[in-house]
Amino acid sequence: MANVKVKIGIIGGTGVDNPNIMTDRQEKFVDTPFGKPSEPLITGNIQGVECVLIARHGRKHTVMPTDINYRANVWALKEEGCTHIVVTTACGSLTEAYRPGEIVFPDQIIDRTTKRPSTFYDGQTNSPVGVCHIPMHDPYCSVTKQILANEAQKLGIPHHASGVNVVIEGPRFSTRAESRMFRGLGGEIISMTAMPEVALANEAGLCYAAIAMVTDYDCWRDDHAPVTVESVIATFKVNVANAIKILIAAIPEIAAKDWTEIINERKSQVKPPILDSTWVMFIREYRKIGSDDASKLM
């Protein structure tokens, strides 16, 4: 069996959604069964590896976490032929050990979101058929995550190779009571966009990993000033340069690996398998006209 050709989707947060990190850039307007992605795709190359970039919040950071079209973003990357999704995200720290300015490569999630469609299989006319009970015991791809951590180590960037990511609805920050509750649940960092993004990537059979940039201590500490947007942005700007360094160094390492077995295993966990837009259109018309006339669509 031929090796799987690696193509990497990048979902960038503020500062890491700059298309200048790519060569041979082209803007591509796409639509999906779930609507349009946050922004047009940017296709191109990083270190000779084909990549596709999406600005998660829009290039002007105008889309709040709840309103991001996560399904369209992930679906668009799947249809572009991506095998991996590597994302960047800001996060707060829920432990003294993870300090502002450091990088975390999370391996687990506690989902506290409440308002977001979290599956492609929602029973609507534009969705794949059936119900997908995707395994989520290890939501992040451990192999991709380790490559990112290895490159951070080589670059001498302070980082943590694992972390439990608590994902809140936002856009507000936590109360002190909530922050302490999240610590009690085992959370180590807190962010707003990993869910349903990682679940959808798993439904799409893609390897998903994150570069989480610690911008602040969340408000669980009595002796620390409350979180403010200004303090978060100031630290985040310092983190961005390190995140880009890791991304650029890791992408050729990801591409050099034979992912055939891992990708096939991920695809085998998706039951029923995810379908492309052509098949979704077929299903939509099939439902309209009924099985007796389905041959007309062949």
Curated annotation (Swiss-Prot):
Is Nucleus there in the keyword field?
yes
Residues binding substrate are M192, D216, Y217, D218
For this UniProt record, the keywords arranged alphabetically read as follows: Cytoplasm, Glycosyltransferase, Nucleus, Purine salvage, Transferase
The UniProt record lists the keyword Signal: no
Q: Which GO molecular-function terms appear in the entry?
A: S-methyl-5-thioadenosine phosphorylase activity
Gene Ontology terms: cellular component: cytosol; nucleus
User: Which family does the similarity line name?
Assistant: Belongs to the PNP/MTAP phosphorylase family. MTAP subfamily.
Q: How does it assemble?
A: Homotrimer.
Q: What does this gene product do? A: Catalyzes the reversible phosphorylation of S-methyl-5'-thioadenosine (MTA) to adenine and 5-methylthioribose-1-phosphate. Involved in the breakdown of MTA, a major by-product of polyamine biosynthesis. Responsible for the first step in the methionine salvage pathway after MTA has been generated from S-adenosylmethionine. Has broad substrate specificity with 6-aminopurine nucleosides as preferred substrates.
Protein name as catalogued: S-methyl-5'-thioadenosine phosphorylase
Which species? Nematostella vectensis
Q: What is the lineage of its organism?
A: Eukaryota, Metazoa, Cnidaria, Anthozoa, Hexacorallia
